[in-house]
Structures are given as C-alpha cells and as structure tokens.
Design a protein with these regions (language model features):
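Residue-level detector of conserved, well-ordered beta-strand and adjacent loop positions
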Residues: 56-59, 84
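A short acidic, often aromatic-flanked loop/helix-cap motif at beta-alpha or helix-coil junctions
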Residues: 60-64
C-alpha cells in the first residue's frame, strides 16, 4: 500500500512549495536529508520502490511539473487531509486552500497541451450488440436473453418524455425463458451464444481495453451472425424493416431490381457502419446480392446472406474514429475535435448502448451535429426516447456492482427469512430498490443528490418484511408489484443504506466493514482503495469461544497495527463501521449476537466525527461535492469507455462546479458530460493497425 510513506513524501514536498522556495540545490539537500530518514529506504534506495513512488526521481521543479499524475495525487491527499500525516503539524484551512489552488494551476499548466488518454479500438459487448441488431433490423424484441438486465419491466412505465414515474410498477428480476405478459420466448430461436465479455476492475463492461477481437472470437461472431440471419424469428411479423429490406420488389425488371438493391443497401450499410458507405464497398455488396440471386437464391435469402456478412464485419463490430490528420503521428500530439459521425456513434453508445438512428446520421452528414445548439437538442431528444431505458438497464447496475447480489447466500440457519418458496431468495426483491430509485431520478430529472438522501423509496411486501427480519409468503415471487412510498425512517433510502448493498457486502454469517467501506470509497466517491497485502488472512467464518466474545471492530484491530495497512484503514474503516447497524441482510440491529453494543463511531474525511449512522449520513450529504465529482467521473468513464487521467481533471472540475451551483439534475449532468471536452475530442489511437488486421480475417464475401 505505502500510503504512510507517500504521506510523508507529499508533506515534505509541499512544505517547500508553501514556503515559496524553489527546488534549488540547497533546498534539495534539506529535502533529501528528511527523505533519507523517513522514506528513501522504501521508496528508491537500492531500486526498492513501494507504493509505486520513487523519491529519488524527484530532482527539480520542472520534473514535478512534468508529472501530472503526481500533481493529481498531491491534490487528492490534501483534499482528503491525508497530508500532513497525523504525526505532523496540520495545515490551517487558509494554507490548505492556498496549496490546492497552486497545485491545481500547476496541474492545469501541466496538461493543457497534452492529449486525452487514448481509447483503444473496441468492439461491441453483448448488450450493445443485441441493441444494435435490434435497432438496425427494427426488431420488436431482443435476439438474446438479456441477463445484463438485472431488472425487467413488466409494465410499459418507462416513459421519459412524461417526466413522471407511476406510483407503482410491475417488474421482475429473475432471468426467464418466457415473457410473463404475452408468453413469447425471450430471445430469437436458434441464435448462437455471444462470447463472454470481461469487466474491468473498478470499471464497466464497455471498457475498450477488455473488448478485443481475436481470431477465435471472430469465428464465434461469424457463427453468431449466420444464426441470426437464419433464425425463423427473423420474419415479417417480428421485423419492422421487412418491407424496405427483405421483401421482394414488385418490379421484375433487372435494372429496377439492381437499383432497389442499391438503395436498400445504402440505407442498411450507413446504419450498420455508422457512416456513409464508400462506393467500392457498396458496389461489392450489390454484386454479391445479385450473384446470390443469379445462383438461384430468393430475394429474401439474398438479403439474409447480406445480413450475415454485415453483422460479422469489423465495420459493424468495432467502434473507432477517423482522424482528419493525414499524418497519423500528429494525432497523439494534439487534441482534435471529434468528427460528426463519430460523435453520433459516441452519443448512441452512451445513451442507447446502440448505433445511431437516421436523425443523428442525417445531421452528421450535414455537418450540423457538432453545433452546440443542435447537439443540445439532440441530447434532449435521445434522453426522452424510450431507448434511453438501456442506459438505466446498464449503467446503474454496474456502477453499484449489483451483480454481486446474485451470488449472495446468507446462512439459511441464521437468516431463514431470506429464503422464499421454490428456492427463491429475498435478494430478488432487494435489487429493484436502488434501480427504481435511479430510474425515478432519471425519468423525473431529479437532483443526483437524491441518490444519497431521497425522501421516498420503492418497496413491495416481501422487501418490507425482509427489513423487519421475517418472511412473507407469496405466490407471485417472480413478477413483483413495487410501490413508491414516502420514507418516514431516515435510516433507509438511497444507494448506500439499502438491503441490496448491505447483503452483497456481507459474508453468509457476518458483516464485513472493510468490504463495505471499500465499496463506498470505490462506488460513491470513485476512490477505490489499493488491494490489501497478499499475506493478510480473512477473518474466520466459524467463531472460536474467544472470538465470539469480540466485536468486529476488535477482531480487525490487528490489521490496523500494520504500517502498510493503517493508511487505507483510516479511509475505509470509518465508512464501513458506520454501516454496522445493518446486519448481513440489511436488518437494523443495535447489538451483536453476543450482546455487545454496535459501535459505529468514527472520523470521516479526517475531520468529521460521528457517533451514529444518521450523523454519518448527514456528513456524507454535507460533503456532497465529493459524491458529485465521484458520480460524474463514473459517468464520464462509462461514456468514454476508458479510465480517466489527469487530462480529464479540468472537465471534471467544471462539471462538478456546475452541478454544485444548481445544475445537478440527472439530465443536466448527462448533458454536461456529452458536451464536455473529453467527450467531444478525437480518440488518440492508431486506427489502421488493428482494424485492418481484423478485416483481413473476415471472409470478404461481397
């Protein structure tokens, strides 16, 4: 971890800055003398580097200015009051503010001419692929059983254009082979499975560095596209594009048929490839279609063959940009404004997890989409479109890491009420609570602060019973009626204090304050802690007679005694122990099983003392700027499909300031991201190598 040593390092560097001295030789001698005594032995001496901090590399002020990551870290430890260390004299508020301003100016100067972090060329993930095929072919239902959707809507209540959620909704949270409302199979018959996607640690499943296209995967996509084109469910009843794509032309004249094919393929390929199709490619596809017909295939079967080819091509599977620069080397040297067609794709991926529609593509073709006024109106239109439900299907569940709840199995002997009829668990009633809260804030365009402290929640009878620590029998455990209810108990509500999060961050028998604290740091503030040392053993699940007498805080005391653990625990433990009133299934408790009182007291952000959970919650809301910045940074990372870096900091600062000044509604925040510099700048990657290499591996039938 090395956080203690880093704090010493930052402290002594900043003393020089605050004193107004430069990194002249005499000051370097004095700093090095201190560092030799406290830090060098672990951070540079003999090639030994702990915590990825090498103090011997620091030789001048210019070198410090050339390290934006270091400057960003300095700003972070000052804001979090991790610097100076506890053993040193603390900075006054005025000193701290002055230092932060100075460092932020240095960081701004350091990165002003630097490009944004590159986004690798990335392929579609499973969710994006399904949505893109559905939108391309205008299908009435998914081609896959969408396990990514942890919650399914059984009412047609998602109507963002109304800005109003109904008082009750019918949903389900269990993957089913049948659609409950109309008894249609979910997913197209005969469609092959999609290759398994990876998810980045502390990231999302749309991250470019985890979405590649190896030869083995390419073979899988070829098979997948073939099965889609051959599915019996791809028919005139399920496919609204049938009339303009698959239906045989009325005219039998060869010239008319060729022109009709060309017109249809122009529309299809522009949609599929998210840009105008070049004449050579279009001619190849037209010739391929005509050759199919000359070989005896029907018009419908010829178009099915075209679909099979299109859905397996890198032009469809990959998302990438095209630079205006004729010299690829120039792309990494400067920031370039994004092209309109790439902007259309980026917007559709962010809000719809899909391809752009014809409106976006038409505006891109006219060069109007990047106009700020036009862009603003299009963002409003996209957020009011029903397809924005996909954003609510995808982002909040990943942000909150709710898939962890699926594998939560509280001890049946201790928590028998958790298990319902036929093996169903209470977790399926816990999951909708935070997801419906997110949807409400999105649809009604409410303040994102309500994610922390709403005055309402969503519950059904079985979830209410779980909070009370008992079971409620019910026959309809799959399709659930959730009602929006006002909160009279301030201990409930929000994305932190709910049964779903409390259950998924516990073991089968006990709570895990460290896990809960790490979750709050990573999810709520986007400040994930470093992994613990490999030699730290987990707490035993089975209590010995001696351990049974201790509280969780007493059991974990040994971890804090290690110098390489103390720094992280100072940040994690207060947040984790603040949640100790919530048992392993989210039921409130004041005492442990051994009769000992639950102690939730702590110091938050190294400055705010609290003794109860409610005091903790008040501090979190009071320090809402930390949450606002963390939430926006999560959204920006999701929108860009990459991790963030120092060059993104100015945009994050600007968006956070705007939200704190009153523009904190969900849609205002989403719009600010889609109109931010990082979102509107060209990806700085070398396009040709990977995309052309992948194209060479695809059978080029046309």
């Amino acid at each position: 971890m090395g956080k203690v040593f880093r704090s010493y390092f930052y402290f002594f560097v900043l003393l020089q800055i605050f004193a107004g001295t430069s990194f002249a030789d005499d000051s370097l001698l004095r700093i090095n003398s201190i560092l030799d005594s406290h830090c060098i032995q672990c951070h540079g001496e003999g090639g030994k580097v702990k915590g990825k901090v090498n103090l011997k590399e620091l030789q001048s002020a210019n070198l410090l200015s050339s390290k934006p990551e270091l400057l960003e870290s300095l700003i972070g430890v000052i804001k979090d009051r991790e610097m100076p260390p506890e053993e040193e004299t603390p900075l006054s508020d005025s000193e701290r503010e002055e230092l932060l301003k100075w460092l932020e100016v240095k960081l701004s100067d350091s990165i002003k001419d630097q490009p944004f972090l590159p986004t690798q060329i990335r392929r579609m993930n499973r969710f994006q692929y399904n949505n893109s095929v559905v939108d391309l072919l205008e299908l009435d239902r998914p081609i896959f059983r969408l396990n990514e959707r942890l919650m399914r809507r059984r009412d047609n209540y998602f109507k963002p254009e109304t800005r109003k959620m109904p008082p009750q909704v019918r949903i389900s949270t269990r993957p089913l082979s049948k659609d409950i409302d109309n008894q249609r199979p979910e997913g197209f018959r005969g469609v092959a499975s999609f290759p398994q996607d990876k998810r980045a640690e502390h990231g999302y499943d749309n991250r470019a560095d985890h979405l590649t296209l190896s030869p083995l995967l390419m073979e899988s996509f070829l098979n997948l596209s073939q099965t889609i084109s051959e599915s019996p469910d791809l028919n005139s009843k399920e496919c609204r594009s049938w009339s303009w794509l698959f239906a045989s032309p009325e005219s039998a004249n060869a010239e008319d048929v060729e022109e009709i094919i060309r017109t249809r393929l122009t529309k299809l390929l522009r949609r599929a490839f998210r840009r105008p199709v070049d004449p050579v490619t279009l001619d190849r596809f037209v010739k391929f279609t005509l050759d199919q017909r000359d070989a005896g295939a029907t018009f419908e079967d010829s178009m099915r063959s075209v679909i099979a080819v299109v859905l397996s091509m890198p032009d469809f599977l990959y998302f990438y940009g095209v630079s205006d620069s004729k010299n690829p080397a120039d792309e990494s040297a400067k920031k370039q404004i994004i092209r309109d067609f790439e902007l259309a794709s980026r917007l559709a991926l962010f809000f719809w997890s899909s391809i752009p529609d014809d409106v976006l593509l038409d505006l891109a073709a006219e060069g109007k989409l990047s106009d700020p006024k036009v862009l603003s109106l299009q963002i409003d239109r996209m957020l009011n479109d029903h397809k924005s439900s996909r954003f609510c299907d995808n982002f909040p569940a990943q942000w909150l890491q709710l898939d962890r709840l699926i594998t939560s199995v509280p001890d049946p002997k201790k928590f028998s009420y958790f298990y319902l009829v036929d093996g169903y668990r209470s977790s399926m009633h816990m999951m909708p609570e935070p997801l419906l809260l997110f949807e409400t804030i999105f649809i009604e365009d409410r303040s994102i602060i309500e994610l922390l402290d709403p005055k309402y929640t969503w519950e059904n009878a079985m979830l209410k019973a779980n909070y009370e620590g008992h079971a409620k029998a019910g026959h309809d455990v799959v399709t659930q009626l959730f009602k929006r209810v006002p909160l009279s108990d301030p201990r409930r509500g929000g994305v932190i204090s709910n049964a779903a999060v409390m259950t998924m961050t516990a073991t089968p028998t006990r709570t895990q304050p460290i896990t809960r604290g790490a979750w709050i740091n990573a999810v709520i503030f986007n400040d994930p802690p470093e992994p613990p040392p490999a030699d730290i053993p987990p707490l035993p699940e089975d209590d010995t007679e001696e351990l049974a007498k201790l509280t969780i805080r007493e059991r974990l005391a040994a971890h804090r005694e290690r110098k390489d653990c103390a720094g992280c625990h100072n940040k994690i433990d207060p947040m984790g122990f603040a949640m100790e009133n919530y048992g392993p299934t989210g039921v409130w408790r004041d005492k442990y099983e051994n009769g000992r009182d639950v102690d939730v007291s702590g110091v938050l952000f190294n400055q705010h003392e609290f003794k109860t959970f409610l005091e903790f919650k008040e501090i979190i809301v009071k320090e809402k700027e930390r949450f606002v910045r963390g939430f926006i940074s999560h959204l920006l990372s999701y929108a860009l499909s990459r991790e963030l870096g120092p060059t993104d900091s100015p945009a994050l600062d600007e968006m956070t300031d705007r939200a704190m000044s009153g523009e904190d509604s969900m849609r205002a925040v989403l719009k600010s991201i889609a109109m931010s510099d990082p979102f509107l700048q060209m990806d700085n990657f070398k396009r040709n190598e990977k995309i052309e290499d992948s194209k060479s591996k695809v059978p080029q039938s046309p």
